[in-house]
Structure formats: structure tokens, C-alpha cells
Amino acid sequence: MLVAALLTLCAPSGALAAVNTIVLQSSPITIGPFGVARGIQRVDSPSVDGNVVSMSADVVDLAGNPVPNAHVMLHHVVFVKVLHPDYTCSTFTGYDGLPSPLPVERFYAEGEEHMSLGLPNGYGYPNKGSDIWGLVYMLMNHHNSADTVRVRYTVRYATGESLRPVTPVWLDMRNCQADPIFSVPGTGGSGSSYEQHTDFTMPESGSFIAGGAHLHGGGLQLELTDRSWGGRLFTSLPTWGGEMPTPMMHEPGPVQMTTFSTAPGLPVRRGDTLRLSAQYDNSAPHTRVMGIMILYFSPGSVDGLSPSSIPLTGAPQRPPYMRLPLLRRPRGPLARNIRSTAVGDYVFGNQRVSIPRGTTFTWRFVGAEQHDVTLASGPVGFASPSLQRGSYRHRFTRPGTYRLFCSLHPTLMTQIVTVR
């Protein structure tokens, strides 16, 4: 099928209209035992002009066989078009914390919920054969041995026909970052919720004709509203209960998020203020979470169109409570009343710490690789960015036992901070 599709794509420009399925793969990605691989690489793209009408991704071994989620988890992948400006970001910060030297447009993403792109008939995401695609990835290896895999992506590609062009619109609680995380404190009590939101003003009129969303463990819903007329546009709800990878290296996310694909879509007008709200359970901490919605926008006049919304498909479900264990017991003497520790490669300098309530504690990053400080369990949720140099501070205002780890090296780097 792949060979036939490629031959069709290489046909002369006068060829009949066709929609072909193209299967492509990333370069090999090696992940250490119980490790996390993050990075950015250039990937292949269709070699002739056309339109992407659908897209999906998965993880395969070097022989092309699908890899189970319980073995290597596709935590998330983002496909970008290099040298194209993004609709909501003027600059993009990579995993290294540095701004991208080139503009990139985020046009498709997939996480644990395995969202696939499917545009309505008559619409397409324009692509030139000369366009450059990139892949931003985060994969997790749940086995005690190194593994090498590829990200496989399947593109349905229309050529030889004129489709209405769509523009990807990425909305995010922490926009313009490769790792757009925040943490839920978990201090609200039983049945409580925690919400963050972000606003974006539309620079032009048109309609959203497709969209999907990405939440992490503890998520309740992502809701898009148009504050200019006060109405709801789309609510994406999670489904829980998938296969549980072991060991549990992070709080499991939903196995599905509701999406929409419809024409003529959801009309919005130039100057409208869109608000994306991410709602999480606040009865327990949830760290390194995200709140993202990617929409596909068809610009044009919406005169005469009334506001509309995607019907709700249910109500938010309370996510299952998952207590994240420490995968390595912290070692060494108990360090009392200290205010800082070094974080080197694969080790916290002081792994067992006891401090009085109200202490502001500092982690100093001094390794050759990136690491972070993330709460596994404890009274209040927090997490640092991934850092190679610099420091991170947290003020401990609630007594209790804080079990901490590095989310990039969860079986190697752990720490317990007891707050008196």
C-alpha cells in the first residue's frame, strides 16, 4: 500500500484527484531501562503538494510491529511544520529551555488518549512537497531493559483537488513550550476541583470544523467558550480505565478524549475572546499535568451564522485515584534543618531531609543532563521544570511526608522530605 501511494504521489501534476494513505516512520529512538526519552527530530513528509485530511500515530519496533502501551508508552507526540508561523505562538521553547531559532507550526498531536485527526469532507490542511516536518516526542519505557522504537504515523493525503484550507489553532495553559506543565495542589478536599484558564483573541473570522484535547491523570474536562457572546463552543471529556503499565512511572492519563469534526463548524468572529478552561480533581495532588486543545480553523465570512456549540456527550467523570509509588527507596543519613541540596546526574545530594514547616527549600541542578523535582505523593502537589543548570525553590507550608522523584529517571532518583 505504501509503495502504491508513493507512486501515485509522484505522478504528473495533471493526474486525477486521489486520496492516498501514506505510512511513514521517525528515526530510531532509544530509551533506557525504565527511562523517558524526549527530543525533537526532523521526519519525512509527503513529497508532493496536497492536503492532509486525516492523521494518526503509534509506536512500533524496528521490524514495524506495534509496541504495546504497557511496554513503551506514547506519552505524547507533536508534529510541527518548520519555517511556518504558529497561529498562537511567535516563539517556541524546546525541552532545553531555549527558544527555537526557527518558527514552527504545531499541526497535529497525540497523547495517551490516542486522538486521531479526521477533517470533514471538503477540508484539508495544505502541505507542499518542499515543506519540512518535525517531531516533538516523549516516550516512556516500562521495562527493565533498553529498547529502540520508532514513531509511525499514517497520513491520508489528498492530491489533485481543491479543498477548503484549515489552519491549526493550538490553545494551551502553558503555551509555546515543549513541556507545558503545571501542577494541581490537591488541597481542596473530597469532591473539589481546580481550574486554570487561558484566553486568546481571534485575529479573523471563520469556523472551527474539528478539534480534540489533551489532559493528564486527574483531569475532569477541557472546555472552550466564546466570552464575546458568553456561550460554550466545545467540551472535551476524558474516558478512564485503560491498561495500567507497570511499574507506574507517572499518573496514568485518560484512554480517550471526546473530539468533534463537523461542517460548517463553530463560527467565531474577529475580535472574539476565546477561553480554554482546564478542570482537574483537587482532592489529591496531580503533578506535571497539561491542558491543551488543538482546533482546525477555516477562515472566512460568518455573516448570517448564529453561534453554535457541540452537544455534550455526557458529564465529567471523577478520575480514579492513583497513588504514585516511589520506585527506589531513598538512602543515606537524615539531613535535618538544611535549606538546599544539589541535584546531580541520577542522584539527589540529600535523599532524606527533615525541615520545619515554613522552610523554603532549594534544589541546585549541577548535572550534565536534565533532571526535575516532582511530587509522587504528599500534602501538596508541585513540580519543577526539567533543568540542567539553575535552581528551583518551594516553600513547604503544610506538614507531612513529601515523596519526591525525578520524572525523567523515576527508578534512579528519589527523595523524601519530612516537614515538621
Language-model segments: which ranges?
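Beta-strand-centric surfaces of beta-sandwich/beta-rich domains
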Residues: A18-S207, G212-L326
